[in-house]
Amino acid sequence: MTELKRTPLYEQHRRAGAKLIDFGGWEMPVQYAGVIEEHKAVRSKAGLFDVSHMGEVELKGKDSLAFLQYLLTNDVSRIQDNQIQYSPMCTSAGGVVDDLLVYRYSREHFLLVVNASNTDKDFAWMQAQAEGFEISLENRSGDFAQLALQGPWAEKILQKLTSMDLAQINYYWFKHGEVDGVLCLISRTGYTGEDGFEIYLPPEHAPRMWERILEVGGSEGVQPIGLGARDTLRFEARLPLYGNELGPDITPLEAGLGFFVKLEKDNFIGKEALSAQKEKGVPRKLVGLEMIERGIARSHYPLQKEGKEIGFITSGSFSPTLNKNIALGLIPPEYAQIGETLDVIIRGKAVKARIIPSLFYKRQG
C-alpha cells in the first residue's frame, strides 16, 4: 500500500481531532466540528482551510506567454502583472486535462496552480507540449504550503497580521508581502463562493501561521474547515470539481465554462474540437437539480426521463444554505428546461428531481 502524503499541517489537524481521509493520495482533514457547522461558519463568519496539497508549477522564459496561449483555452494575454486567471487546459479532443489558476509575475514568469491529484499528470502534460518553446518548467509543489481564509470576516482577520492594505487587493489579483513576519504571496481567490484569500508560504512557516490565524480570528468566530465543507461550499457556488463536472470526457462548453474558452484566439490545444462543438451545439449540458422526493443524488448516479437513461449526476449533496438536497447533472440540452422533472436512480429506485437554475448560491455585495 502506498503511504499517504501529508501536508505540513498534519499535526495541527490531528491535535484538533479532525477526521482524516485519503484524498487523492493525501491524508487530509474531511471535517472537524462537522460539515454543516463548518459550511455555515464560512458563509456567515470565516473558515481556514489547509490546501497545501495543491500543485504549483513555475514557468519561466521568453516564450512563457506564447506557451500558455497554446496550452490553455483562456486568453492569458489579457492579464497584467500580479493578476490571476482561471482556465481549463484541454486535450486536442476538447476534453479537460485539468482546470488551473495562472498567476502572472511578468510576461516571462508565471506560477500555475493545479489540482492536487493531477499535479504529476499535469506537469508531464505541460512538458510534452513545450517542444519548440523557449521556456523552463519546474514542479515547485514541495516549496509551498497554502492556506485559504474564506468568508465575510476573512479580510478583517488577516488584516490583523499584516501591514499591507488588503482592501487594495482586488478579486483575482495578488501581492507579495509579510504576514506575521513571513514573506507570503497573498491572492484574493478561493473555492467557496465567498470573499477571501489564499496564502502561499514556505512549508516550515505553515504550522505557526495556521495557529496565528485561528488565534487572532477567534473573536470573529473563525473555524478550521475540512474538505467536506469545501466541497459543499464550492458546489453551492457552482464551482466545478475536476473528476465530477470536468474530465477527459467532458468539455468546458458542456460544463458551462464557455466564458473561459476564447475561440477567437490563435491556435491552442483543443481549439478545433471546441469550435466544432460550439458550432454544432453541445451534446450535453450541466443543469441544477433539486430533489422533490427524499434522497441524496450522488456523483455518477444515472438520470432518467420516462424510464430512458439520459445522463448522470456529477455532484450532489444536502445544501446547508438552501436546507434541501440539490445536485448537478449532465444531460442532453433538449431535456434541460427549468422546471422539467427527471428521475435520479438511487440504489435501483427512481427518485424525482426538478431542474432549477444551477447557481444555487451567490453572495450579496
Curated annotation (Swiss-Prot):
SUPFAM superfamilies: Aminomethyltransferase beta-barrel domain, Folate-binding domain. It catalyses: N(6)-[(R)-S(8)-aminomethyldihydrolipoyl]-L-lysyl-[protein] + (6S)-5,6,7,8-tetrahydrofolate = N(6)-[(R)-dihydrolipoyl]-L-lysyl-[protein] + (6R)-5,10-methylene-5,6,7,8-tetrahydrofolate + NH4(+). GO terms for biological process: glycine decarboxylation via glycine cleavage system. The keyword Magnesium does not apply. One of its GO terms (cellular component) is glycine cleavage complex. The keyword Transferase applies. Transmembrane segments: none annotated. One of its GO terms (molecular function) is transaminase activity. Keywords: Aminotransferase, Transferase. The glycine cleavage system is composed of four proteins: P, T, L and H. Belongs to the GcvT family. The glycine cleavage system catalyzes the degradation of glycine. This is Aminomethyltransferase. It comes from Desulfitobacterium hafniense (strain DSM 10664 / DCB-2).
